[in-house]
Design a protein with these regions (language model features):
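Anion-binding alpha/beta catalytic cores of soluble intermediary-metabolism enzymes, centered on
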Residues: 1-267, 272-335
Length: 335
């Protein structure tokens, strides 16, 4: 069974309620139809039912009738959700009038469904920007306890089974926080290890905090940040297996790890890689993807109290379908 097959199987085993607020986007609706047909999640669509069914008929989709469809313009819960939004944001300048307007936005409405306990996760981005996806999530659902920054992990399925977990690595941050400080980097480490467990199914995440230095081989303030982040990550999660700073070869190659970091439990055996900044992470995963012919699944947003994931506006139907399964796995772990 491949990694994505195992993710889908886990999603099927305990179906979660996943909101797809961009319901009139053709790829999204097609992916919803596939997810409903395969029973990987209970899908909630936001929008006018007549318009959604008309698009489904045009696309030849047969399973949309199995979805829960909620129209913010007519839902009996809209007023209560508007009140909830006002209460959550009144100290930030929210007014009842503004809340009544925002609740009609499908992305806000979906996050309010989750906050109210009526759904488990949300996926958008086929039409919306990352900012439009994250803003309601952070305002309504907020970050996980002990976490103050959102980050993005990527599942890297490589052609080299001797690395990571049979060739699978979970890496972060590749998507959100450009220049994390030591505290944020520690949070990214903890969250990426959790993603490795909940989504990739790693029983034993081994986290390497990457740098251009291994265990003091170089001196620089950016190395100091990684060392401090490693210490803080251990404080955040005393059970986390994490070491740093490590160079990439020392983290992945057993013979190199033994030479550069003798006695290390992680060196040469890492399956979770944490990059010192977004610039490095984004470049590194794309190089591995293109030059190493690796499959990259994600980014998977992490650090939010309930899963909210962001798609590329160039995403495929298959990308959205996979993200439904991934979000479902995250939702199980978040409960």
């Amino acid at each position: 069974m491949t990694l994505i097959e195992s993710i889908i199987a886990r999603a099927k085993s305990n179906r979660q309620r996943i909101v797809l607020p961009e319901s009139l986007e053709e790829r999204t609706l097609t992916a919803a139809d596939m997810a409903l047909a395969d029973e990987i999640a209970d899908i909630i669509l936001i929008g006018n039912p007549d318009e959604i069914f008309a698009l489904a008929e045009k696309l030849g989709l047969k399973n949309i009738g199995k979805a829960t469809i909620i129209d913010p313009a007519t839902s009996e819960k809209t007023a209560a959700y508007a009140d909830l939004l006002y209460e959550l944001r009144k100290n930030k300048g929210m007014t009842p009038e503004k809340a009544a307007q925002l609740v009609l936005d499908p992305l806000y409405f979906g996050c309010l469904i989750i906050k109210s306990g009526d759904a488990d996760g949300q996926i958008s981005g086929a039409l919306s920007t990352t900012g439009e996806t994250l803003r309601p999530a952070l305002q309504i659902i907020k970050c996980s306890p002990g976490i103050t920054c959102v980050s993005g992990a990527m599942l890297m399925i490589t052609q080299t089974p001797e690395y990571g977990e049979d060739g699978v690595l979970v890496v972060g941050d590749v998507a959100v926080t450009p220049m994390p400080d030591a505290s944020q980097l520690a949070q990214i480490a903890v969250c990426t290890a959790q993603t490795a467990k909940s989504v990739a199914g790693f029983a034993d995440p081994k986290v390497a905090m990457l740098s251009f230095s291994t265990m003091g081989s170089a001196k620089h303030e950016v190395v100091d940040k990684v060392i401090e982040a490693t210490k803080l990550a251990r404080e955040l999660d005393p059970n986390l297996k994490v070491e740093g700073e490590l160079q990439a070869d020392a983290a992945l190659v057993a013979s190199v790890g033994q030479k550069k970091a003798p006695g290390s439990e992680i060196a040469g055996h890492a399956n979770v890689l944490v990059f010192p900044c977004l610039e490095v992470g984004n470049i590194a995963y794309k190089l591995v993807q293109r030059l190493g012919n690796a499959d990259a699944i994600g980014p998977i947003l992490q650090g939010i109290a309930r899963p909210v994931n962001d798609l590329s506006r160039g995403c495929s139907v298959d990308d959205i379908y996979k993200m439904v399964a991934i979000t479902a796995c995250q939702a199980m772990d978040a409960k």
